[in-house]
Amino acid sequence: QINDSNILILGLTFKENCPDIRNTKVVDLVKALEQYNVNITIYDPYVDPQEAKKFFGLNCLNLPPNNLSDELFSCIVGAVKHDAFRGLDIDSMLKSNGVIYDIKGSLVHYDKRL
């Protein structure tokens, strides 16, 4: 069930390891998921949160990964292949029955991938 789920999206930029959010397709993903009444958290260490808000009306966190582990997510989406995501402790952020949708193949958790 996707309704009312907490979803973490890793990455918002147009391409990996750069701050450019112009022409990003991640916004399309966010808009599609919002139709299901989900709670979306976007984390991208390269994005200026004010720019994400200004251009797309999205809240984007640029907090260090360890600050995200207080909340458990039903789904984690690897949307951009930033080097900064390699060391993330995905298991500590994911519910026990949660899933990982790894669009870019950057998250190494084969047992929970869709």
Describe the function of each predicted region.
Residues 1-114:
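Structural/interface elements that position substrates and couple domains in central-metabolism enzymes
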